[in-house]
């Protein structure tokens, strides 16, 4: 695990007594080959290329898995741009693939914004989505968490071989990983005050023409979701089933965010042992460029620090390209770099 942000300023001589450690393979082959994985999260600071990396990973996984789903939980919903295809809140097949599906959700909108396909007739839909939103608004964070819970229930029911999450920036990502705890805490609070809010719930049900329903019945309905939540929570903390891939660029602020994310993942007991360093500049000796050389020098400094701090991680180095990675064909081409280290012009 990382030594901590403070270690970035340590002079090189302080590492002289440390034994040499053989660097781990600089690819995501370990992820592709670990067939027990069911949940793969890709995240990091905004603007570092998370979506391109997560879509590329999903493409590579689709070549060896029966069915793959990539979910965007980022309100920006860039996977539609990456594949040049419009996706919705329901899993849709990616053009050109028989076993790769994509969907985009915005958990911050809450349960009431999810489509009817997410709700079983005898469960949340029968209570009315608007009432659910009103009831949940009393518990900070639980509406978003319940939205995650319903998505997980849907996804688990479809039995995808593996699910890749293209996550929002760090704060949203940590809420996603903590949603089981938030839901359980919210339900506990609901049980404490159920007698006080029972008239409100009954009134809402009558207004919606749903008949009488008291707080006990609402709590019972919500508790039906708990087995799924607890199952997912256990899987998230199992390194055989879940891992997190950090994406960053070789700059101080991005590395700082990556270190903070890794520390938070450790607190959540979420496995992480892969870092993608994106947008690296590799000067071409045949086409001198002072700015490129200066940029390369700065990036090399942070790369050296990363290799000292994260010696137990697979560090994948990806180049800054002169074009956008947009469309299924370009994503497929770029995805090869996840399995084969990039060779800059000077090394060819």
Curated annotation (Swiss-Prot):
One Gene Ontology cellular component: GET complex
Q: Which GO terms describe its biological process?
A: protein insertion into ER membrane; tail-anchored membrane protein insertion into ER membrane
Q: Which GO terms describe its molecular function?
A: arsenite transmembrane transporter activity; ATP binding; ATP hydrolysis activity; membrane insertase activity; metal ion binding
The catalytic site is made up of 74
Q: In which tissues is it expressed?
A: Expressed in the epithelial cells of the liver, kidney, and stomach wall, in the adrenal medulla, in the islet cells of the pancreas, in the red pulp of the spleen, and in cardiac and skeletal muscle.
List the InterPro entries.
Anion-transp_ATPase-like_dom, ATPase_ArsA/GET3, ATPase_ArsA/GET3_euk, P-loop_NTPase
Please state what the protein is called. ATPase GET3
Source species: Homo sapiens
């Amino acid at each position: 695990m990382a030594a901590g942000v403070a270690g970035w300023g340590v002079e090189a001589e302080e590492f002289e007594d440390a034994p040499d450690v053989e660097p781990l393979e600089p690819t995501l082959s370990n992820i592709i080959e670990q067939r027990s994985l069911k949940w793969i999260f890709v995240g990091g600071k905004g603007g570092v290329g998370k979506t391109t990396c997560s879509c590329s990973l999903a493409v590579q996984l689709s070549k060896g898995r029966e069915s793959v789903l990539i979910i965007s939980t980022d309100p920006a919903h860039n996977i539609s741009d990456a594949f040049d295809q419009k996706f919705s809140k329901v899993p849709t097949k990616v053009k050109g693939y028989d076993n790769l599906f994509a969907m985009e959700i915005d958990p911050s909108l809450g349960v009431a914004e999810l489509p009817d396909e997410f709700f079983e007739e005898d469960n949340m839909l029968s209570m009315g989505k608007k009432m659910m939103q009103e009831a949940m608004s009393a518990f900070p964070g639980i509406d978003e968490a319940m939205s995650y819970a319903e998505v997980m229930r849907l996804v688990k029911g479809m039995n995808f071989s593996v699910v890749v999450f293209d996550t929002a920036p760090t704060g949203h990502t940590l809420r996603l990983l903590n949603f089981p705890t938030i839901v359980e805490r919210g339900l506990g609070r609901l049980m404490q005050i159920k007698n006080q809010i029972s008239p409100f719930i009954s009134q809402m049900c009558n207004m919606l023409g749903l008949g009488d329903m008291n707080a006990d019945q609402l709590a019972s309905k919500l508790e039906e979701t708990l087995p799924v939540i607890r199952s997912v929570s256990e899987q998230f903390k199992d390194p055989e089933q879940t891992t997190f891939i950090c994406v960053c660029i070789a700059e101080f602020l991005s590395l700082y965010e990556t270190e903070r994310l890794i520390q938070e993942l450790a607190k959540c007991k979420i496995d992480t042992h892969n870092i993608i360093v994106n947008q690296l500049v590799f000067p071409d000796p045949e086409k001198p460029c002072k700015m490129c050389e200066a940029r390369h020098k700065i990036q090399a400094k942070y790369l050296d620090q990363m290799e000292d701090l994260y010696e137990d991680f697979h560090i994948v180095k990806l180049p800054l390209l002169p074009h956008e990675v947009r469309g299924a064909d370009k994503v497929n081409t770029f995805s090869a770099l996840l399995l084969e280290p990039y060779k800059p012009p000077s090394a060819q």
